[in-house]
């Protein structure tokens, strides 16, 4: 087994002191992380890490594709695919690993075209953000991409899935995304990815009136 030790100390703060490799596969590895809490007590944590990280800004990209067409409501493009760890179909943003020497923006456009067939333009790219920090150290860039639906190449897009990838492209209206996610999840017994659902919630709250503050009596 592989163990990495740290000799640094930081009183009053959390500090990882060692990471012991338990098992490793092609894509992920399982480690026992030993750390010190602010009181000086040593604790352990079971951690999953990707084996593909090589000094990149993040492991992957998650793409928020917004389809814009003349005389149509804006739509969000999602992909439905079977996820073995969940044992069910999931509704997600297009996503994938960043390849060596590739920028997050280039990776986002590549993954979007491969998984949905659409070609777009990057509107914004987030810094690296964590995916599931209680379980793994996986990080991603969230990249918003606009798609010109009037462009001839985007009228009948053809996905280019890789080996073993079986996806269904789903377009949902942006102005009613949360309601449509709930309905689709119930009808097709789908599990909606947390990032997609959080985006739907954010859109709903952004377009609704502010939460009312309870009247204070003196």
Curated annotation (Swiss-Prot):
<feature type="binding site">
    <location>
        <position position="95"/>
    </location>
    <ligand>
        <name>Mg(2+) 1</name>
    </ligand>
</feature>
<protein>
    <recommendedName>
        <fullName>ADP-sugar pyrophosphatase</fullName>
        <ecNumber>3.6.1.13</ecNumber>
        <ecNumber>3.6.1.58</ecNumber>
        <ecNumber>2.7.7.96</ecNumber>
    </recommendedName>
</protein>
<dbReference type="GO" id="GO:0006139">
    <property type="term" value="P:nucleobase-containing compound metabolic process"/>
</dbReference>
<feature type="binding site">
    <location>
        <position position="115"/>
    </location>
    <ligand>
        <name>Mg(2+) 1</name>
    </ligand>
</feature>
<dbReference type="GO" id="GO:0000287">
    <property type="term" value="F:magnesium ion binding"/>
</dbReference>
<feature type="binding site">
    <location>
        <begin position="45"/>
        <end position="46"/>
    </location>
    <ligand>
        <name>substrate</name>
    </ligand>
</feature>
<dbReference type="InterPro" id="IPR020476">
    <property type="entry name" value="Nudix_hydrolase"/>
</dbReference>
<keyword id="KW-1017">Isopeptide bond</keyword>
<feature type="domain" description="Nudix hydrolase">
    <location>
        <begin position="56"/>
        <end position="196"/>
    </location>
</feature>
<comment type="similarity">
    <text>Belongs to the Nudix hydrolase family.</text>
</comment>
<dbReference type="InterPro" id="IPR015797">
    <property type="entry name" value="NUDIX_hydrolase-like_dom_sf"/>
</dbReference>
<keyword id="KW-0539">Nucleus</keyword>
<feature type="binding site" description="in other chain">
    <location>
        <position position="132"/>
    </location>
    <ligand>
        <name>substrate</name>
    </ligand>
</feature>
<dbReference type="GO" id="GO:0005634">
    <property type="term" value="C:nucleus"/>
</dbReference>
<feature type="modified residue" description="N-acetylmethionine">
    <location>
        <position position="1"/>
    </location>
</feature>
<dbReference type="GO" id="GO:1990966">
    <property type="term" value="P:ATP generation from poly-ADP-D-ribose"/>
</dbReference>
<dbReference type="GO" id="GO:0030515">
    <property type="term" value="F:snoRNA binding"/>
</dbReference>
<dbReference type="GO" id="GO:0017110">
    <property type="term" value="F:nucleoside diphosphate phosphatase activity"/>
</dbReference>
<dbReference type="GO" id="GO:0006338">
    <property type="term" value="P:chromatin remodeling"/>
</dbReference>
<feature type="short sequence motif" description="Nudix box">
    <location>
        <begin position="96"/>
        <end position="117"/>
    </location>
</feature>
<feature type="binding site" description="in other chain">
    <location>
        <position position="83"/>
    </location>
    <ligand>
        <name>substrate</name>
    </ligand>
</feature>
<feature type="binding site">
    <location>
        <position position="115"/>
    </location>
    <ligand>
        <name>Mg(2+) 3</name>
    </ligand>
</feature>
<dbReference type="GO" id="GO:0044715">
    <property type="term" value="F:8-oxo-dGDP phosphatase activity"/>
</dbReference>
<feature type="binding site">
    <location>
        <position position="111"/>
    </location>
    <ligand>
        <name>Mg(2+) 2</name>
    </ligand>
</feature>
<feature type="binding site" description="in other chain">
    <location>
        <position position="27"/>
    </location>
    <ligand>
        <name>substrate</name>
    </ligand>
</feature>
<keyword id="KW-0479">Metal-binding</keyword>
<comment type="function">
    <text>Enzyme that can either act as an ADP-sugar pyrophosphatase in absence of diphosphate or catalyze the synthesis of ATP in presence of diphosphate. In absence of diphosphate, hydrolyzes with similar activities various modified nucleoside diphosphates such as ADP-ribose, ADP-mannose, ADP-glucose, 8-oxo-GDP and 8-oxo-dGDP. Can also hydrolyze other nucleotide sugars with low activity. In presence of diphosphate, mediates the synthesis of ATP in the nucleus by catalyzing the conversion of ADP-ribose to ATP and ribose 5-phosphate. Nuclear ATP synthesis takes place when dephosphorylated at Thr-44.</text>
</comment>
<keyword id="KW-0694">RNA-binding</keyword>
<dbReference type="InterPro" id="IPR000086">
    <property type="entry name" value="NUDIX_hydrolase_dom"/>
</dbReference>
<dbReference type="InterPro" id="IPR020084">
    <property type="entry name" value="NUDIX_hydrolase_CS"/>
</dbReference>
<feature type="binding site">
    <location>
        <position position="111"/>
    </location>
    <ligand>
        <name>Mg(2+) 3</name>
    </ligand>
</feature>
<dbReference type="GO" id="GO:0019303">
    <property type="term" value="P:D-ribose catabolic process"/>
</dbReference>
<feature type="modified residue" description="N6-acetyllysine">
    <location>
        <position position="217"/>
    </location>
</feature>
<keyword id="KW-0378">Hydrolase</keyword>
<dbReference type="GO" id="GO:0009191">
    <property type="term" value="P:ribonucleoside diphosphate catabolic process"/>
</dbReference>
<keyword id="KW-0832">Ubl conjugation</keyword>
<dbReference type="GO" id="GO:0042803">
    <property type="term" value="F:protein homodimerization activity"/>
</dbReference>
<feature type="cross-link" description="Glycyl lysine isopeptide (Lys-Gly) (interchain with G-Cter in SUMO2)">
    <location>
        <position position="41"/>
    </location>
</feature>
<dbReference type="Pfam" id="PF00293">
    <property type="entry name" value="NUDIX"/>
</dbReference>
<dbReference type="GO" id="GO:0047631">
    <property type="term" value="F:ADP-ribose diphosphatase activity"/>
</dbReference>
<feature type="modified residue" description="Phosphothreonine">
    <location>
        <position position="44"/>
    </location>
</feature>
<dbReference type="GO" id="GO:0016779">
    <property type="term" value="F:nucleotidyltransferase activity"/>
</dbReference>
């Amino acid at each position: 087994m592989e163990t990495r030790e740290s000799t640094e100390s930081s009183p009053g703060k959390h500090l990882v002191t060692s990471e012991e490799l338990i098992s490793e596969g092609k894509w992920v590895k399982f480690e026992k992380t030993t750390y010190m809490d602010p009181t000086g007590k040593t604790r352990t944590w079971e951690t999953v890490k990707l084996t593909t990280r090589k000094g990149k800004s993040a492991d992957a990209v998650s793409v928020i594709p917004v389809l814009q067409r003349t005389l149509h409501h804006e739509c969000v493009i999602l992909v439905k695919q079977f996820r073995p760890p969940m044992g069910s179909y999931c509704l997600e943003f297009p996503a994938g690993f960043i390849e060596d020497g590739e920028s997050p923006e280039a990776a986002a456009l590549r993954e979007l075209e491969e998984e949905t067939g659409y070609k777009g333009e990057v509107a914004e790219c987030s810094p690296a953000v964590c995916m599931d920090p209680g379980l793994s150290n996986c990080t991603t860039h969230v990249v918003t991409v606009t798609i010109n639906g009037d462009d001839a190449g985007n009228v009948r897009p053809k996905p280019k899935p890789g080996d073993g990838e079986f996806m269904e492209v789903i377009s949902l209206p942006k102005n009613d995304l949360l309601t449509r996610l709930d309905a689709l999840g119930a009808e097709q017994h789908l599990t909606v990815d947390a990032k997609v659902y959080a985006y739907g919630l954010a859109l709903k709250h952004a377009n609704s009136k502010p939460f009312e503050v309870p009247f204070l009596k003196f």
